[in-house]
Swiss-Prot record:
This is SAGA complex/transcription factor TFIID complex subunit Taf9. Belongs to the TAF9 family. Signal peptide: none annotated. Pfam families: TFIID-31kDa. Disulfide bonds: none annotated. The modification Phosphoserine is found at residue 159. Component of the 1.8 MDa SAGA (Spt-Ada-Gcn5 acetyltransferase) complex, which is composed of 19 subunits tra1, spt7, taf5, ngg1/ada3, sgf73, spt20, spt8, taf12, taf6, hfi1/ada1, ubp8, gcn5, ada2, spt3, sgf29, taf10, taf9, sgf11 and sus1. GO terms for biological process: RNA polymerase II preinitiation complex assembly; transcription initiation at RNA polymerase II promoter; transcription initiation-coupled chromatin remodeling. It is found in: Nucleus.
């Protein structure tokens, strides 16, 4: 993190990076990541490049091919960038008007029941739809020492409920 009170000699790097550090410290920014000056330089480079390209287009349109860029071309490019890229928030009155229009429509009434409405239970898939019955246990008395316990398990009847 960088701190305020940075002198020009204490910052290592290109002149532009030192300039960004000095601007941030003069604005009273107490601390920032070391990537912030690089991001600001990238933004400034892209913005300047776009202004020069737009100025060149305006110069070629007004004075022909390979015309030099004039101050008026740069001013026009800056004005178009400000109108296009840097838009402010809408006016407060406009937002209040939109809010009043939206709030005119009443909210739906709250139903006496809460949650999701489910269909009747017989149509819901939340209930089991099968019955397990063991015919051998119902018809015969239990044997305590049965060696064929697996055979009895195989006789379980899985039938589907019919309603």
């Amino acid at each position: 993190m960088s701190s305020p009170g940075i002198s020009d000699e204490s910052i290592k790097g290109p002149k532009d990076v030192r300039l960004i550090h000095l601007i941030l410290s003069s604005l009273g920014v107490p601390s920032y990541s070391q990537t912030v000056p690089l991001q600001l330089l990238t933004f400034a480079h892209r913005y300047t490049q776009q202004l020069i390209q737009d100025s060149q287009v305006y110069a070629e349109h007004s004075r022909g091919q390979n015309a030099p860029i004039s101050v008026e071309d740069v001013r026009l490019a800056v004005a178009s960038q400000i109108n296009h890229s840097f838009t402010g928030p809408p006016p407060k009155e406009f937002l209040l008007e939109l809010a009043m229009e939206r709030n005119r429509k009443p909210l739906p009434q709250i139903q006496p029941s809460y949650g999701f409405r489910l269909p009747p239970e017989k149509y819901c898939l939340t209930q089991p739809n099968w019955i397990v019955s063991n015919e051998t246990q119902q018809n015969q008395p239990k044997e305590e020492n049965s060696s064929d316990s697996r055979m009895e398990e195989d006789k379980l009847d899985f039938s589907v409920k019919s309603e």
